[in-house]
């Protein structure tokens, strides 16, 4: 059921991330549920956008967790994770990213209980794509966003700054 996702993950396996990605592949292989569209309350797909403007990476302030994260969101039914990353980047920052992207990482993220939405704790398999910023005027952003240099970024995202000149 999740062969398309598994094949994408296999393309980014390195010695550095092999153990983590094998665990995610096994999770996808054992899942009998559609993971797009929030159908499965325990395990869902999300996608994040890594977009640089010069040496700075875009971050948003998450509306519930109140922390700086990459622009991201749930993968909708019949949507690819890449399309989600592009859509969410635009919605959350108002900026546009080119319809191209390179998968650079996949993570299993524990999402805490959300009292506001009465959403139980669950996990996301998060596909992280490097996207290129389009040179056009931004529209209205849904969320506060920040352009941060390496030294200002949350620790877990600092490893992505190696992609800034690709």
Swiss-Prot record:
GO molecular function, one term: hydrolase activity
Pathway annotation from the record: Cofactor biosynthesis; tetrahydrofolate biosynthesis; 2-amino-4-hydroxy-6-hydroxymethyl-7,8-dihydropteridine diphosphate from 7,8-dihydroneopterin triphosphate: step 1/4
Residues engaged in binding Mg(2+): 88, 92
Keywords from the UniProt entry: Folate biosynthesis, Hydrolase, Magnesium, Metal-binding, One-carbon metabolism
Identification of the protein by name: Probable DHNTP pyrophosphohydrolase
A GO biological-process term: folic acid biosynthetic process
Protein encoded by which gene: folQ
E.C. numbers: 3.6.1.-
Main EC class the enzyme belongs to: hydrolase
Domain Nudix hydrolase as annotated: residue spans: 42-166
Cofactors: Mg(2+)
Alphabetized InterPro entries for the sequence: NUDIX_hydrolase-like_dom_sf, NUDIX_hydrolase_CS, NUDIX_hydrolase_dom
Summary of subunit composition and partner proteins: Monomer.
Pfam family, one: NUDIX
Function: Probably mediates the removal of pyrophosphate from dihydroneopterin triphosphate (DHNTP), a possible step in the pterin branch of the folate synthesis pathway.
Family statement: Belongs to the Nudix hydrolase family.
Chain positions of motif Nudix box: 73-94
């Amino acid at each position: 059921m999740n062969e398309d996702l598994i094949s994408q993950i296999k393309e980014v396996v390195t010695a550095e991330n092999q153990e983590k990605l094998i665990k995610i592949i096994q999770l996808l292989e054992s899942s009998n549920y559609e993971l797009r569209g929030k159908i499965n309350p325990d395990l869902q797909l999300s996608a994040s956008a890594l977009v640089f403007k010069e040496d700075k990476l875009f971050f948003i302030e998450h509306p519930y967790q109140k922390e700086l994260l990459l622009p991201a969101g749930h993968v909708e039914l019949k949507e690819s994770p890449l399309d989600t990353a592009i859509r969410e980047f635009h919605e959350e920052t108002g900026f546009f990213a080119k319809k191209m992207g390179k998968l650079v990482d996949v993570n299993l993220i524990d999402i805490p209980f959300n009292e506001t939405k009465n959403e139980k704790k669950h996990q996301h398999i998060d596909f992280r794509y490097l996207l290129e910023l389009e040179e056009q005027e931004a529209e209205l952003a849904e969320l506060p966003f920040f352009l941060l240099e390496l030294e200002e970024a949350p620790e877990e995202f600092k490893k992505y700054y190696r992609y800034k000149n690709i």
